[in-house]
Amino acid sequence: KDEAERNAVLGAAYFQRAYRYYKLTHQFGDVPYLDKEITEPKLDFYSYDRWSILEQCKKDLEFAYQWVPEVQPRGRANKDACGVLLMKICMAVGDFDRAIAVGKEVVGRHPLMTGRFTGNQTKPNTNLMHDLHSVEAKIDMSNTEGIMYVVAHPTTTPLDKDNRIYTMRNALPYWAKGGAIKTPDGKTGTAIAPDEADKNTEIDND
């Protein structure tokens, strides 16, 4: 409709691309870089220097940080999500002064929570830290610490319960599958849920 809206959409797309390339360059180093849509078979990809990719991502994120709105529907990239990624890429390329400046701006808009704020505050043996790491905290609009969320609402329907998103699946490979990693005494070494013996029914809210 206008330049601001166009730039906001473009900035959000730049964020998504920069996020992927930030992870790719840190995991693999030099990788192929695509700056346009591929609409037909292509076999002649070649790698770009990781630092040139990160510098391009930094440029794109400066644009995104300027144009993407502060307030967005949950699950979408907002100004401060762009700012956090910009800060990380600035540190990756050695622009520490810019990283500090952006970091201060983001922190200034997201003060730490200092008081109880979810329905869990009535549970015994809980505190603010429990609130912050609860499911409820991630959908509570009064939570000033939240910057960008992965939206997934657990359901009570047995057939639908596995449609929710597990945070670990977004951050790491599925290393708990099938109990492949064992302890020296043969017990499961990694799991996505606590052992029944370790659960506290008074405070666990999964």
Positions of predicted regions on the chain:
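An aromatic- and glycine-enriched ligand-binding surface/loop that stacks and positions planar moieties
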Residues: D80, L86-D206
